[in-house]
Amino acid sequence: MAGWFELSKSSDNQFRFVLKAGNGETILTSELYTSKTSAEKGIASVRSNSPQEERYEKKTASNGKFYFNLKAANHQIIGSSQMYATAQSRETGIASVKANGTSQTVKDNT
């Protein structure tokens, strides 16, 4: 099953999206947006940037866990991954975002 985006609205009227893999696991979480239109533009940015290896910033958190940020051409963070125990599992996460990030399916939960 192919992945999809889920768009949601927070209790303080901000918007965020997540990218889900085909198994339902969240593989990328966006920043908060002040408008639904901005969040939808963020989804479009994931679609265009996710296939490009150079858009992934690989990081190590202070607790030693591994994660990545997906960045746009202007170097703004579009979304961040979960924390991974190993660098290899982070690479698997990146591969999943590459495989699912071009999805045209958006589940609007706003």
Curated annotation (Swiss-Prot):
Protein name: UPF0339 protein YegP
Keyword entries, A-Z: Repeat
Ranges of the Sequence repeats in the UniProt entry: 10-58, 61-109
Family under the similarity heading: Belongs to the UPF0339 family. Duplicated subfamily.
Domain of life: Bacteria
Keyword Repeat carried by entry: yes
GO biological process, alphabetically ordered: double-strand break repair
Coiled coil: none
